[in-house]
Amino acid sequence: MSFTSSKNSSYRRMFGGGSRPSSGTRYITSSTRYSLGSALRPSSARYVSASPGGVYRTKATSVRLRSSMPPMRMHDAVDFTLADAINTEFKANRTNEKVELQELNDRFANYIDKVRFLEQQNKILLAELEQLKGKGTSRLGDLYEEEMRDVRRQVDQLTNDKARVEVERDNLADDIMRLREKLQEEMLQREEAESTLQSFRQDVDNASLAGLDLERPVESLQEEIVFLKKLHDEEIRELQAQLQEQHIQIDMDVSKPDLTAALRDVRQQYESVAAKNLQEAEEWYKSKFADLSEAANRNNDALRQAKQEANEYRRQIQSLTCEVDALKGSNESLERQMREMEENFAVEAANYQDTIGRLQDEIQNMKEEMARHLREYQDLLNVKMALDIEIATYRKLLEGEESRINMPIPTFASLNLRETNIESQPIVDTHSKRTLLIKTVETRDGQVINETSQHHDDLE
């Protein structure tokens, strides 16, 4: 029996060279039968079986001799020349079969070793795959979820801080608007107070001018009063002188009319008129002076009140200006802090986005690696399936050969030679018959698609 494997077999595809995924495997077995007319017919067969430990057991080749020659007489000599030739050819075939069996055993041992190695690699890959499925993915998912929760929490905190700062900014803006409105009102009130103060100053100036105008008539009246007093005194002295002269004349001349009484009456009349005029002038002057003093006091009070209000407004303006400056400074600092927080938030958000992208890339790489491991595992499964199919095919072939070998075959020890007359019997030409069993197995991706068997008989 001879074993031939084509180049497209899965064994050569995996270990002997590359070929396409779909190939056909052709196994050719042959059995040779030798017939020698009615003399000897050797039949050879071999069987190879794989033990669990990888040890191969070979059953010996038996030779089946069948004789159709007529019985020989005991006194005739037996010619073993043909038997020696057949034994020589049988030994040569036996040697060739042993060599071929040794080669097949070596190849099968290498095949078993490679199958075991692939099974170990398959177990390692399965363990790694289970480890990745059980630990790596969940741990990475937990880390990713934890990182995402931290990022979301920080984003929410920054959003709340931003909203709080915006509310504070809006409140400060409202306070600044109210202060500006109040400042505008205070400035308007200040302008009104200044205009009122200006009008009061004008009134004071007018009152001062009126007082000056009134002081001049008073002075003129006082001068007139002094002049009238002097004139009155002169008239009184003249009248007294005249009265003395008249008294003397009266004394001298009693019969003259009484001028003293007349002068006294005139004097009384003049004095009453002068007193009345003086009293009226003093009363008018006092009333005018009282009015002017009262107006001046009122103007002074108004001026003092206006000055106090102006000072108060000035102090309020200064305090409001300080508050506005302080609020401007605090607003600028808050705006600067808000810009810094926005920049920090943007930077942190970019960093978190980069982290998320990196984690997603790592997850994608892990998924691709898992997919690659799964593909490799699937390829190994396909290879294992193809190897299992080939092993099953080998097993079927070996079982077929074993079934043929296990048939009862007589040996040389049990061979009975009968007496025959070789010279009287013609020797039939030796010929051989070869039976070819061609089995074609088509596989694709480790699966058997088609399996056919053909038998061919050739004569030699």
Curated annotation (Swiss-Prot):
Residues 402-460 are annotated as: Tail. One of the most prominent phosphoproteins in various cells of mesenchymal origin. Phosphorylation is enhanced during cell division, at which time vimentin filaments are significantly reorganized. Residues 263-401 are annotated as: Coil 2. It comes from the Eukaryota. Residues 148-239 are annotated as: Coil 1B. Residues 90-125 are annotated as: Coil 1A. Residues 97-405 form the IF rod domain. The keyword Methyltransferase does not apply. Vimentins are class-III intermediate filaments found in various non-epithelial cells, especially mesenchymal cells. Vimentin is attached to the nucleus, endoplasmic reticulum, and mitochondria, either laterally or terminally. Plays a role in cell directional movement, orientation, cell sheet organization and Golgi complex polarization at the cell migration front. Homomer assembled from elementary dimers. Component of a complex composed at least of ACTB, AP2M1, AP2A1, AP2A2, MEGF10 and VIM. This is Vimentin. It comes from Gallus gallus (Chicken).
